[in-house]
């Protein structure tokens, strides 16, 4: 067993190898503070045929014992990955995936297992570093050393790996990954910070990354691992290179620079098929061998197309859909499309379209959070759906994909900044984004549609939030930043850079970079160009709806809340919940009680019944005085009068002489009657007189 220790950022780091998981191709036991993860790497001996991508899977396995907890539910064991586990898997996958050889076709599986959790030392960020180290000491071809850090910003100071308490007060919460040469991934949120503050956070992160990479280098130099050979191509490589001669650049340019996404794809495929057939005929490639050339020829065609697109952007500043580098696609916005929903919007930017829907619910509908670290509830939820018809494809409909969960999480972090506090707006808010069309930047379209729909629903947001996806083309030191990228520019570009925020600052940030050498100045330019675009998009949102609607939808529940003495919470609940259940049934409402603060929340579809329930409960805790007026319920009828309950357990007599001209027998149990308190004797017994309707 080998062991390496170092103190970094005020906490001890430990890497171990050779003690556990020795049958894996690569394994690292990593400890940071009291957080411990095991990163393992394994690779298949067989090549996967017929694919044009690296078959990599990354799994983040959360174990509840790591936090000293037993899983909830009937089955007391871990099941399929949780949403937080999926997000952590993506966080590890994104910085390591670009470092595999493009022609690796053996299945690679990276598993990061969480064994111990320290709330002040994030296991997902530790997982990035542990996975990098496990890959580098394995036989899997892997070109680079990456590390991850978390950055906070408290009281004007940037903090590397802030504590949980510091994160509560932090204006920035981002995870940054990279090599010693460059930042390659960013994911996080902020509380309306400036572009300069975000840039300095990135620079602080990179300096910290260099230290962790240097520690990894100390470990890796002690291993002399022979990397597995990459598969030899079965086709004639020289013949594939010759295929380039069949591509007419003028014809190719016409097809790449077609205006519409589908038109562009159809024209490009049509041209490709025509030259491939000629290539096969001219080079006498028999039909049974043509299948072997299908993927390499298409890759070569895409490579030439990519180079041409990039060259024209660099030299002419012209993009595939005819825009300049800073141009934003045409934007249209609508609100109030769906009559029965609580709020709705349609945001369209070019060929990307998001239908945003808001649903308001009672506090009882809060989402329960039970992760390794976090326990509690969540009152703002955003879900992102990406159906296959949005790209004109046919695919089976299953549960949400990892991509959908990741995009929804980013949009939720962006919009969360404008959600009013619970004491101002006690509703549970669910936003759903249905992507109806997609050609790049659908997560940022989701941010925009969500902001519009929230105002349409009457949620008292103080401002709009918008997002934009930026790109980068970097050739021989010359870089062009692209605003509002389409799918092709995302696929063939060097960077996908998403920024969301209000007019006052950035609220969410995500970046994936495929190249090194992105300078601080280029990042600054990208941030400020994104700000310019964001302001333009925000103006479009404000033109559509400038402030929240004054009234909620008639179909939204009505909510009222107030406080009672928390020491008397038991009186509202009653024995076995009898009292609160009877009130719920009586008024057809939902009631939630926080017995620690005494906060009572009443919700229901009928506003009048909600108000009646509120008054009923408030009366329960109000001292009864002579002259008070109540609406009560008849509980007993006698010859000498009727007994009326004005609140649970508070029953008094209306003597026949106090009923006016009505006899007691005119009433029946359950009738409602308005009464006035006319006497309270020494024993606390109540006497009422009937009030005329």
Curated annotation (Swiss-Prot):
Disulfide bonds: none annotated. Its cofactor is Mg(2+). GO terms for biological process: mRNA catabolic process; RNA processing. One of its GO terms (molecular function) is polyribonucleotide nucleotidyltransferase activity. The keyword Magnesium applies. Residues 557-617 form the KH domain. PROSITE patterns: KH_TYPE_1, S1. Mg(2+) binds at residues 490, 496. Residues 627-691 form the S1 motif domain. It catalyses: RNA(n+1) + phosphate = RNA(n) + a ribonucleoside 5'-diphosphate. One of its GO terms (cellular component) is cytosol. Its main location: cytoplasm. Involved in mRNA degradation. Catalyzes the phosphorolysis of single-stranded polyribonucleotides processively in the 3'- to 5'-direction. Belongs to the polyribonucleotide nucleotidyltransferase family. This is Polyribonucleotide nucleotidyltransferase. It comes from Fervidobacterium nodosum (strain ATCC 35602 / DSM 5306 / Rt17-B1).
